[in-house]
Amino acid sequence: MTSPPGTRGRPPASPPDLFTFPGRRHARWHAGVLLAVLLGGLYLARRHWPALESGAGRLAGADPGWLLVGATAALGTWAASALAQQGAVLRRLPGSRLVAAQFAASAANHLLPAGLGAGAVNLRFLMRCGLPAGRSAGALAVKATAGAMVRLALIALLAPACPGLLRPPHPTPTTLAVALGALVLLAALPATPRWARCRRALTAVLADIRALHTCPARAVALWGGCLAFAALHSLVVIAVAQAVELPLPPLQVALLYLAASSAAALLPTPGGLGSLDAALALALTVSGAPGAAAASTVLGYRLLTVWLPLLPGLLVLGVLVRRKAL
């Protein structure tokens, strides 16, 4: 068979890239949200600059032993994430590249909002390991669902040990209106044309979860990795709090972190930057911690989990891309 005129010698057309942006409008919306969050963060930083400056000074004189504990726990979070990702797929993944991909994904997660960076890196890695696109996306959904369930279970487990610490907010008319609108949207979802696609995706995720639980080793890896990931992040906050002598018990600090991080996950900011910082600092302050100690705790947590590993993580990301592991 001869080639059509004008196409002889040309390479075959490549499929569209999976990681192209959904559209200029969505990109502008994400950029607008990110700009608003950054401006809000700058405003809060300027308004509370004395507390931030005092917190940074207090962090400089913190106990180095506790900071070392926090740094060790931060290193363990990438291994825990790799364990959970392995538990979300039946196929055996290359261990060293899996850990490196989680390290790179954590760095990419701080550049794009709502987990898009980490999701793109992990999706690409799983596809490079031979999983189809649908199965790769399903594995990410399984891991995210298990992580959310583990986080909620830890909150429910720690809340009785810290009575009165988590107080439900008083509902305002605006909150009630937003909740009512969300319920109306959920009720109208089955009538939309996209419902069939959503139902097929949900059915596929549930099928993947059932298949994983037929293999006990994968189920233990999934739930154990998610539990270790949440516990190690809590340990980082506890260690920094102990290093700066935050006057709150460790269980309360862990519960406040889990609640603040769960709330911050609803806001589309890169890696929770800004949203988690504000939520955690507010939770610690409302619970009785001094503003300077709360600020230094948040700064120390961010230093160990974001700023110190950010550049090495981006370098690892570049190496993985160069070696076609992503």
What are these regions (language model features)?
Residues 90, 110, 128, 242-243, ...:
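Transmembrane helix-loop junction
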Residues 103-119, 232, 304:
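C-terminal halves and exits of single transmembrane alpha-helices
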Residues 1-103, 161-265, 291-296, 304-326:
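Predominantly cytoplasmic-facing regulatory/coupling regions of multi-pass membrane proteins
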Residues 106, 110-116, 144-156:
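Mid-bilayer segments of alpha-helical transmembrane spans in multi-pass integral membrane proteins
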Residues 105-113, 258-277:
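Transmembrane alpha-helix interface/packing and boundary motifs in multi-pass membrane proteins
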Residues 124-125, 140, 152-153:
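Hydrophobic alpha-helical membrane segments of integral membrane proteins
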Residues 87, 117-129, 157, 270-286:
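Re-entrant/interfacial helical elements at transmembrane boundaries that shape
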Residues 97-100, 114, 118-119, 128-145, ...:
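Membrane-interface alpha-helices at helix entry/exit sites of multi-pass transporters
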